[in-house]
């Protein structure tokens, strides 16, 4: 959160009770605090991946079948506990405070599908995704994401950004979305 959302570490450490481990315990910790706005919580892919895979996640290694099964179960449990869904990042713009890429940057289709199936298992939730849409190109990555969504039958929302180096990318993504709907 310090690197991606630019929230200072002291604010995070002082503002949250860090005695929880599961997503349900996290939601309970949030409920104990006074808050002035309504919000929903999504299970974040980065911490999920690091929790399951450890250093292998930070080294951008591929998840194995055991990792995927565990992430699927944790996702289903999180949604049943109250998570609105799952969020992932596939953009080089999101980096840790140390400037390293997020552990989710190049997560493979099998991993994303496994996690998405956790939403299906729970019968609820959506996927939120931020991407550069460049692995290797927007149409190919969108096709992969579409297969993930078809496997789980849950909705997807994604950030639509204008890029200086690809001025029509947003229109291309809207066209791909229209074709998918």
Describe each model-derived feature in a short phrase.
Residues 1-86:
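Divalent-metal coordination cores built from histidine and acidic residues
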